């Protein structure tokens, strides 16, 4: 939650600066990196939660599936689909190079 709010506040700050006419440097690349990391961290948490809830002992008590199979499939599918965020818009390595050039003047 804190990381998400920090990303949102940083995005708003950059947009405000851009609207004011400030030149934008490496900030979009930083946002892209942090955003894709955050999505993957969220997916990992959801995946672990589904894994835990899907234990056989949980469903044995109720006689029903511990997790809705459609939801579990959605979480698993999303986890692997969102891995592509590190590639879309330039791989993480490319984004690191852009940041290095902007910040360090390389």
Regions flagged by a language model, labelled:
Residues 1-106:
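Alpha-helical interface subdomain recognition
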